[in-house]
Every structure is written in C-alpha cells, then in structure tokens.
C-alpha cells in the first residue's frame, strides 16, 4: 500500500469520526422521521467472514447502497457510493469515494460529499457526474434540507489537476433546484439527478425522479450555464400507476455494434441512435428500462412499440439488483453499468458481520442487433483475475438425472462458462398460456421438477452431499402444441442455498430471447455470497445472494447437471479459480 493511500485512509477515518458526531439517522425507505432512533453499530466486524467477497467491490465495513457518479477522469476511474460511516444499516449517508485504473482493483479516499450545509444537513443522497465540454467534472446530487425536503445541489472539484479528485466544494448557490408552491413538486419524492446532456440549442438537460400520487415521472430541468436551472413544463416521460421513479438514467445507444455513445451525442444522422430510459421502481425494488426515441424538439422520450415504462418493462437484472447507474468510458469507447446488490440475510446477521451491500461487477452494456433489448457482459478486466483454468471439458453428454463435477477449481471464488446443446427439441413440454411470469414458473417448477427439456445448468456453492446448493439453469418449452416456436426460461433457484432458515431464498427467473436450435451459453461469476449469472451471452442476467453454512471456502463444489428427461450435450465448459481483487 502506497504512502499516499495510507494518508488517504487516515483522512477517511478522521472524517468518519467527525461526520459521525452530527449526521442524523434516516430510514432505509428514504423516509425522514423527526424522532430518530439509534440504528448504528459501532462494534468491530466479526472475525469470521465466510461471505465477504473476493473480487466484488465493497468497502471494508458498514452499509453501502447506490453507486453514484461513476466516471473516468484523466485516466482514473471514479466510483462514489452511498455509505454509512457509522454502521451496517442504512443511515448517516455520505458519498464515499474510491478510484481505480482498471475497474477491478480500488483505492479508497475520504468521503467526497457529506452533510455540511443547510441544503444537505439531513443527508447527501444519490446523484450523477457530468463532464463539461472543458473537461471539468461536476456532480449533481440530492440533499435533504432542514425541512426534510429533497433538493438538488452541485459540487465541483477543488483541484482539477488532481486525477484522484480527492477534495470537493459545494456551490454557495445551492440548492439549484427545489420544490415550491409554483412548481408543485412533491418535496418528499424529488431525487437522484441524472448525468446531464447538452442539447443542440446549447442548453443542458437533466432529469430527476419523482411522483405525483401514483404517477411516476422524470422531471426535466434545463440550464444554459449549469447553475441556473428552469423546470420544463412537461416531464421527459411518465407512467400512471407505477409509483416513485428512483435513480433514473437516460442515455443513447448505437443501433450498430457494441461501442458506447457519449451522453450528449445525437448521432449523425439521428437515425443511427436509440435512447434508453431506465428507472428504479421504489415499489418493487427492481430496475426497468425501455428503448425508444428522444424527441429533441419537445424534450420527450417516446418508447418503441411494445415497451411501457412500468413493472412490465424488461429489467437489467432479474435478481437482487437496484439503483443502477451507467457512464460513458471515453478511454475504451464503451458504456459501463454499475448496480447495487443488497443482502438477503437478516439485519441482525448484517450487524454481526459488520457490513451490508456490494456492487456487482461492472458490465459493458449495448443494444442488441434486434433493437429490442440490451446486452450486458462483465468488463474484460475481470478476466485478469482468472487463474487455474479447468480445460478439456468438451463434448460431454449429460444424461437424464446426471451431474458432472468440475474438479480443480476453487468453487467458492470462480468464473464458469458453459455451452449446452439441446437434443430433440420436439420433446419439449408445452408452456401453459397463463405462464407469463418467469419468476413464478421458476418458483413452482424448482430444480427438482423434471420436464422434457430441463432443468439443466450449473450447481454452484454446493456442499459435497448436496445438502446445500444454488442452481442456475434453463428449461425449454414449446410455445404451443405442434409449434416450431420455443420459449427459453432461465432460473436461479436459492431454495436450497443454505441450511440457515432466516435468509431470503427467493427463486428468480427470466425469459431469454434466444433460438434454442443454437447452443445455449451460461456464465456464472461465483464469489462466496454472490452469484452473477448471464444467460444467452448476456441477454438475461440474474444476481443472487446466498449464505451457505457447509459449502464455504474449500468445502464448496461446482457441478454441471441435467435433471430433464432428455439428454443434453456440454459442448464446452471452462472454469477458472479467481484471484482476489485489491480493494481497500
């Protein structure tokens, strides 16, 4: 550890002590209460840490939630995040700050933004970074004022020559945007400003999540100088009945290829670009997106046919995943997606272990060639952690009811890629017309239920005798009798993940838009208490949190399996043990 990093940690701890003396407690639901209760935990984390991850981002201790303001500046990646310096539960929120040169290994810095003025004295909530045309980064974030109103503030670096951006200052003009009697904004539901974009009229635009009664909406503000903002008469988009829109994100994607697009770009001509509007629904705690067209004249987002911005929209991730945020990586011409994964353990367990929350591995995100969905894939940099590759698992036949153990890999901290080939598609069961909810299907037809084709996939974090395991698998159905159209279902079944009873063991599911006549790919990033699964080369993603009692460390096992009636071929299986990332 460098002298500079040690100094940073010292400053971080000093600020933590100072901050802890006056920051108020807030509840995790984002409600602010006049009478606050003690919800902090000051004891040291438990020495026994079987569930702490090896290569996912998480601070040394305490609560973490939303990723904030990710960006690249002078070749350095920055990740800010919502952090409680006083305990492993939500409250006392500040903007913690870490930097990296590769998105995998991270060094900490003192908190960048913390309550210090009337416009944020009751909390510094989520926001985003924008790189101005002169290369200067600025942050817009939500502050909680003395009246517990949500207002929007700006902060900028004190020293632009510092690539680590270790010190930030707040504008005396704050708050820049606030609810009042004229604009009629809901003062308790006005938060999480996006990265701003520059229109062709040279005005900046930013959207902020809000609601009016049950109408969720993205309020638009415009500005000529990034300091004086004016509310637009109409929102960028809204939906009646969806409830509060948190952590909105709005960005362009190219229709051709996987390269990213700068947020203010409109393409030449505009037809080569589409736009993505993503929201985090407070009611469901899931992230949804729609693909559509941005009307630059009316400042309106128009979803493509088949898309609706509500709970029926496609999701980034069908598991434990929320409050996501993208940024354009100008160094590698890609768009990167961050997302927060909360715990599935009890609050008491979180307090005992001394921490709560991780960030998923950053993902490259782009538009599928069909134009109907987004593709996600872990950034290439994570592959540098691969070691001890298991090879030559090719052309294996998995007969009905069989398992194939993968030896020679550290199964509790691994990266696995497998390619399946299905035989006899005509043997698939017919899906019931009422089966429209993939999670419900996966829950009712868990891994022990046989069907014509499936379940087949991977058993991860498994104990030797299968008292515990998490299964990630496919099933294939016919769309209807005598049909040559098929439905591919992907499940992540946590029901047998732990002998411990008080964990959330929800089973997750997603339909995968792929052709089952072609090989089916499945990738799993396994990291002690988290499993990130990518089906169909990133067309469906499911993140799970699990806490085995037996299948920990060297006692964890990995299997490929087929419990369907028909045989399945493993065309190729590669597995790697993963080194730990350097995350301080």
UniProtKB/Swiss-Prot annotation:
Stretch forming the signal peptide: 1-28
Amino-acid positions noted as binding substrate in the UniProt annotation, renumbered to this chain: 63-66, 82, 90, 125-126, 191-192, 246, 282
InterPro entries noted in UniProt: ConA-like_dom_sf, Fructan_Metab_Enzymes, Glyco_hydro_32, Glyco_hydro_32_AS, Glyco_hydro_32_C, Glyco_hydro_32_N, Glyco_hydro_beta-prop_sf
Reported impact of residue 282 to A: Impaired beta-fructofuranosidase activity but enhanced 1-fructan exohydrolase activity
A GO molecular-function descriptor: beta-fructofuranosidase activity
Catalytic activity: Hydrolysis of terminal non-reducing beta-D-fructofuranoside residues in beta-D-fructofuranosides
Subcellular location, record wording: Secreted, Extracellular space, Apoplast; Secreted, Cell wall
Positions bearing carbohydrate: 159, 186, 342, 446
UniProt KW 4Fe-4S keyword: no
Entry's EC annotation: 3.2.1.26
Transmembrane segments: none
Main location: secreted
Record-linked SUPFAM superfamilies: Arabinanase/levansucrase/invertase (SSF75005), Concanavalin A-like lectins/glucanases (SSF49899)
Disulphide linkage map: 442-491
Family membership: Belongs to the glycosyl hydrolase 32 family.
Function: Beta-fructofuranosidase that can use sucrose and 1-kestose, and, to a lower extent, neokestose and levan, as substrates, but not inuline.
Protein name: Beta-fructofuranosidase, insoluble isoenzyme CWINV1
Classification of source organism: Eukaryota, Viridiplantae, Streptophyta, Embryophyta, Tracheophyta
Gene that this polypeptide is encoded by: CWINV1
């Amino acid at each position: 550890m460098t002298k500079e990093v040690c100094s940073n940690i010292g400053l971080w701890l000093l600020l933590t002590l100072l901050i802890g003396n006056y920051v108020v407690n807030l509840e995790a639901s984002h409600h602010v209460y006049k009478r606050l209760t003690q919800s902090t935990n000051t004891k040291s984390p438990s020495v026994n840490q079987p569930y702490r991850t090896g290569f996912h981002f998480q601070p040394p201790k305490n609560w973490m939630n939303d990723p904030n303001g990710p960006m690249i500046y002078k070749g350095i990646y920055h990740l800010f995040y919502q952090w409680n310096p006083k305990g492993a539960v939500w409250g006392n929120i500040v903007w913690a700050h870490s930097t990296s040169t590769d998105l995998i290994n991270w060094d900490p810095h003192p908190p960048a933004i913390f309550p210090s003025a009337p416009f944020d004295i009751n909390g510094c909530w989520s926001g985003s970074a924008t790189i101005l045309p002169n290369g200067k980064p600025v942050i817009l974030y939500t502050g909680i004022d003395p009246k517990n109103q949500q207002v929007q503030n700006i902060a900028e670096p004190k020293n632009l020559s510092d690539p680590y951006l270790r010190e930030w200052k707040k504008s005396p003009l704050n708050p820049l945007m606030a609810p009042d009697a004229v604009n009629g904004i809901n003062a308790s539901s006005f938060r999480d400003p996006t990265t701003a974009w520059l229109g062709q009229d040279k005005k900046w635009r930013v959207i902020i999540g809000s609601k009016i009664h049950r109408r969720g909406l993205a309020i638009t503000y415009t500005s000529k100088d990034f300091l004086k903002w004016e509310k637009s008469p109409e929102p960028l988009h809204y939906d009646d009945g969806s409830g509060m829109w948190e952590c909105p994100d709005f960005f362009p994607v190219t229709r051709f290829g996987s390269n990213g697009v700068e947020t203010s770009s409109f393409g030449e001509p505009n037809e080569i670009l589409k736009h993505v509007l993503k929201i985090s629904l407070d009611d469901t705690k899931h992230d949804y997106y729609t693909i559509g067209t941005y009307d630059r004249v009316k400042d309106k987002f128009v979803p493509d046919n088949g898309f609706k911005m509500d709970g029926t929209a496609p999701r980034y991730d069908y598991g434990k995943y929320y409050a996501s945020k993208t940024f354009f990586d100008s160094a590698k011409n890609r768009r990167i997606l961050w997302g927060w994964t909360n715990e599935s353990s009890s609050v008491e367990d979180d307090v005992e272990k001394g921490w709560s929350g991780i960030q998923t591995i950053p993902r490259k995100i782009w538009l599928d060639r069909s134009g109907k969905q987004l593709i996600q894939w872990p950034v290439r940099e994570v592959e540098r952690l691969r070691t001890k590759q298991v090879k030559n698992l090719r052309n294996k036949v998995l007969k009905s009811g069989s398992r194939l153990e993968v030896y020679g890999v550290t199964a509790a901290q691994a990266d696995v890629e497998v390619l399946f080939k299905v035989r006899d598609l005509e043997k698939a069961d017919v899906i019931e017309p009422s089966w429209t909810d993939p999670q419900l299907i996966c829950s009712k037809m868990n891994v022990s239920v046989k069907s014509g084709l499936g379940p087949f996939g991977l058993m991860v974090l498994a104990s030797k005798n299968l008292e515990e395991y998490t299964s990630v698998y496919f099933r294939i159905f016919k769309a209807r009798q005598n049909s040559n159209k098929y439905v591919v279902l992907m499940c992540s079944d946590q029901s047998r993940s732990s002998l411990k009873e008080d964990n959330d063991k929800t089973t997750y599911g997603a339909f995968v838009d792929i052709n089952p006549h072609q090989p089916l790919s499945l990738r799993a990033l396994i990291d002690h208490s988290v499993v990130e699964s990518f089906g169909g080369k990133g067309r469906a993603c499911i993140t799970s949190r699990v806490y085995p009692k037996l299948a920990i460390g060297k006692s964890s096992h990995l299997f490929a399996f087929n419990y369907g009636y028909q045989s399945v071929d493993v065309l190729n299986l590669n597995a790697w043990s993963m080194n730990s990332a350097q995350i301080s």
